[in-house]
Amino acid sequence: LIEYERGTIFAIDGGEDAPGLLAPAAGPGRDGARPATADLGRPARERFARAFDKNDKRPRVAVIITGLGLARDTSFRAIEEMPSDVTLAFSPYSDALAPLLARARDKGHEILLAVPMEPADPRRRDAGPSALSVSHSEGATRQRLQTMLGLVHSHVGIVGDLGDRFARDPVAMKPVLEELAAKGLLYVENRLETPDSGTISNGVPTASVSIWLDRDLAPEAIEREIKAAEALAKRTGS
């Protein structure tokens, strides 16, 4: 595994779904994933999830690569080279989202949108012009999120990008979780100190990072983190 662009490879506890193929891709729209909660009675997070055998009770580890889309060629290489069980998170700042998403779905990858959120040190880490900020009104936060969600399709949810200030603010996060609940999406918190994954917040299934795999990019260091993720999954049963 390698770091792609400025993205982070990390492991989270996995979910479950019935075995089968990925659902056909939905078309993009103003409000993002379409169809969502009304689609065949299943929310988008289930409709577009990568399926696995729920009767297989072995512990699971979910791996997500974030920050894709900022460099077209590197992103296509990630889609082609990563196993289809790896979830890919794409930046809304990409200028090649449509072909990247189409190829990712064709290769069987589950898709997340990496939503930029205000960091604790914005002068050192720039989340970009579309970032969600604690200074925004609830309406502005909803509008920004809806605009970003409208850029992608066939995704199961979002993962926070930076956001160690925004995501800690329950008032700021409230409209985000409400929008995700309405669209049948899940939320992945990209911070190690958050509660265990698998919880429900404002009606939204949430997961949090258990281990970062690329703190040290040396192959042997990444291998150690992978083994640590395996050990954690065996210890916790997920």
Give the positions of each predicted feature.
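Active-site mouth loops of central-metabolism enzymes
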Residues: R60-G67, P129-G139, D214-A221
